[in-house]
């Protein structure tokens, strides 16, 4: 089966060089991983500019090789399609993303396309500030707020109604007599810049990790499990659009709609402006490029929209973005500062990464003391020396990055950075894991304190078990305390064996949440030490008992989260989901052959090899054994074979195009829960192809191979009545 499937995939892209296919797969995986970190964790690890660069590289690759552009490609998806904490809800009208421009030439090219489409008609442009916040959709029925949801994948978002109700300026009821029967109102929730620094100061005071920027503060505050926490944060909202509108007519221009929104009591931006053409847009962009910090919220660009609603309909949309609107992204901000030192950190997979310590400097509204340098080759390429004055950019107003040195300011005291030959934490000689690797790694995975600390922090984090009160400080205390000499966590397997008695004696350094280094007493300069889990009377702190309760609750997390938490190389949230969905238990994954693993959608050869290598290590298998002994199921019982009939067992189904009543993931889940296998390519072995709007080449191939094709009504028949009934309503080449 594995060979057949791989052959099918290869046949579909025979004209594409293997190098291009491999590069496409790498880029797609990186982009999906970064989207997950951005939308689920509210903690991106790359800048907006770097993410945009990756996405553009993928788009350019697909332009050269259109066969690689599938509906599953990140270029065809609306960002944000991950939900973890809140109930999924569907938007009546889809929320799209925006296409981006980054310079005047690209902006002018967009204007030329609009002019070609609209000809000699009179039209105007509405300019808005692009708020760097969290996109939210408000639904009002007969003037009453009934739901607030995140954008999600554009069709399905997270229900955050209780939290949005805590934002004072969002009315529970629309003002005035003339309110529609149903209206969706789109906007951005943001955290005011003037309050952002105050919040981070309080978090630092409490020993909690501060937010990297105001956007993360808004997202993190809005996605709290307890609405009281949200209510304590000074969140605001700006509305900027209407989705579904029923029971109201007469709007001809978007700028009129904004007047209407304001009359209903909703917060609109005072900065919006209607202009006649490109020169007016350029003027607006230039003004706010120079005055961006005069605005109450962070901005990362300007949104330009065709103002006439009738013409918006004529211009239409692509699968992910309207053609009548464009986002102009400002260049990241840059400042000069001193490069004090280059240090190295060790990650959970042993990767050793240099990072810069700079003299504290304010950039893009926040103070920066550390910046990324990626690897030793990047340090060489940038040409920076320790002691240099360097140009620091907070790219996308998120992740600080060093661009290069100001070489003219060198005085001869600067020195080169030398990558250490040994792990800075355990002393093990560093090495590349395979020939050609740029990154050096510490191979001492079992005993390296840094790797264990980072793995435990990742396991407890939002992407995996999502254990409250368990951050990097707790992970450090449990894996490397000053007292007792034997840490309570020797490896991840000990997590569910923690008790109050094991926690109370622990003493550890008080760590700075930003740098991970011990804090020092401002008077004595000595490193601060604290009893982490006990109060002055030696009793457990309130958070200690809560931590143990949350650890116990984490035993029931879905299998995919445990797989992700094993820190297997190349296995992130997407691959973990694929493995859990296909094999449904940790034992089946361990027993699977490399070929069976590789043939799983979303896995592939490199991940399959890494999984087999991980399970070949004795102490890795011991982690799994300990978790089982502690009562962790390590299987997805909800999809087990013992839960009754699976009417679509043995079927292979391809889903393509846009369905009205299902998201792509929702359709896959509906099929997989009934036993069907969902694949990304059509072959003679495909049982059915389900098609929505804009199905693309897969529909053509299905007709060519005479594979039964189901529209959305036929798909419903398949789910409700089974394959025989679906075959009766399917389309085929003979028809």
Swiss-Prot record:
Pfam families: BRCT, DNA_ligase_aden, DNA_ligase_OB, DNA_ligase_ZBD, HHH_2, Nlig-Ia. The active site is at 130 (n6-amp-lysine intermediate). It is an enzyme of class 6 (ligase). InterPro entries: BRCT_dom (IPR001357), BRCT_dom_sf (IPR036420), DisA/LigA_HHH (IPR041663), DNA_ligase (IPR001679), DNA_ligase_AS (IPR018239), DNA_ligase_CS (IPR033136), DNAligase_adenylation (IPR013839), DNAligase_N (IPR013840). GO terms for molecular function: DNA ligase (NAD+) activity; metal ion binding. GO terms for cellular component: cytosol. GO terms for biological process: DNA repair; DNA replication. It catalyses: NAD(+) + (deoxyribonucleotide)n-3'-hydroxyl + 5'-phospho-(deoxyribonucleotide)m = (deoxyribonucleotide)n+m + AMP + beta-nicotinamide D-nucleotide. Its cofactor is Mg(2+); Mn(2+). Residues 1-11 have a biased composition (Basic and acidic residues). Its EC number is 6.5.1.2. Residues 643-732 form the BRCT domain. PROSITE patterns: BRCT, DNA_LIGASE_N1, DNA_LIGASE_N2. NAD(+) binds at residues 48-52, 97-98, 128, 151, 188, 305, 329. Belongs to the NAD-dependent DNA ligase family. LigA subfamily. HAMAP family: DNA_ligase_A. This is DNA ligase 1. It comes from Streptomyces coelicolor (strain ATCC BAA-471 / A3(2) / M145). The lineage of its organism: Bacteria, Bacillati, Actinomycetota, Actinomycetes, Kitasatosporales. The gene is ligA1.
